[in-house]
Amino acid sequence: MRILFAGIIARYPLGGVTWCSLMYLLGLRSLGHEVFYVEDTGECIYDPEQNTRSLDPAYGLAYIDHALRPYGLGDSWSFVNYDGTYHGRSREDVAAFARSADLFINLSGGTWFWRDEYASIPRRAFIDSDPAFTQLSIAKNEDWYVKFFRGFTHLFTFGANIGTPASPVPTGDFVWHKTWQPVVTSLWHTDAPPRRDRYTSVMSWTIESFTDVGGNKDIEFLRFIDLPARTGPRFELAVNGPERLLQENGWATVPAMQVSRTPGGYRDFIQSSRGEFGVAKHTYVATRSGWFSDRTECYLAAGRPAIVQDTGWTSHLPSDAGLLAFSSIDEAADAIERVDADYARHARAASDIADAHFEAGRVLSSLVERASMGGRHFADSASERGERAAEGQWTVQRTPATAASEESEGKPSGMR
């Protein structure tokens, strides 16, 4: 199968974002598919060297090439700048690939355009990595946004509960199918013991996108800010948030860009960690979306236990060893104690969970099979539309943030 894949590697040229697209490309190729990467967001790239948006795409172009070329994909990409100019492969090359493509996959808004070459591909799948936020934005009924999603033949989401009675998020006429971020586990496995005796995370304190429909991680994190007082200084965060506030409460911090500047640096930070302690965005939690982090999957694949906030994902994944859920500060402290009491067992279980649930071959075989079927992504019955959600008129409960910050996780302000 020939697959045109749209991602956001240059738009957000940072380690964690890069791995998301890269593992789709590598996973699909390992299944025997021919892949081509395109990026066509209509927006300026973020340039970490200048710490700002840039009209000059040079940094992003070099970054894409450095990310893809080591894996044999150096001649299989095209970047469309905000001004419509093509870099890497030409528009003619993209159109030629698309003419014989079987499937178009758009991850996280790798393009917001329906150019003829994209629209002509028989199967067109969108991968929603921001569940609840995406559906709540669609529910605002902005014409261009609704029409954009109607252009796909299949819609997938990292929110395992979206469109089910477990979550009140309105889905309207759209049908969303559950999927996970694929992980090429062989690229994350390590036999080396962790160099840090701390649980870590790479996190965004706040983001600017979707501020009118949801709440961010700062709201949730404040509920757990006293955790080090119970467990001791066990945590290290890569965050560009309120570092003084965090440090005063026992959280060690490192510059987010130091960790996220490259895919290699991001992976090294995860592999060197004892495990992950992860808090979710408020909207993921409040809507019981079932969202599960691509970053957490990488910790697990590295054999690093993960202690992460429950968003409803516990209905779909194991949560007793290697991967532990919490909803309260007491549960978080207990989870730390449990992992510390038998670290080797939890580390083995972490790897097993990654292999069983997130291995790229497994995830992508299922996705491609479903995307190749006739199917439909428009609901035609009240039960499918989840009228319970529409009638509930879901609104996000927000509290004032105590501090503003730039993004971390290597994502500049405006990251979805």
Give the location of each predicted region.
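Hydrophobic anchor at the start of a short beta-strand
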Residues: 33-36, 124, 199, 233-235, ...
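Catalytic binding pocket for nucleotide-activated donors in carbohydrate/polymer assembly enzymes
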Residues: 7-10, 15-18, 22, 29-44, ...
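Extended catalytic core of nucleotide-activated donor transferases of GT-like folds
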Residues: 4-31, 36-157, 161-166, 260-265, ...
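C-terminal alpha-helical cap of glycosyltransferases
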Residues: 360-401, 406-411, 415-416
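Residues that mark the start of a beta-strand
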Residues: 1-3, 123, 198-200
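Short, polar loop motifs at secondary-structure junctions
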Residues: 108-113, 159-162, 239-245, 309-313
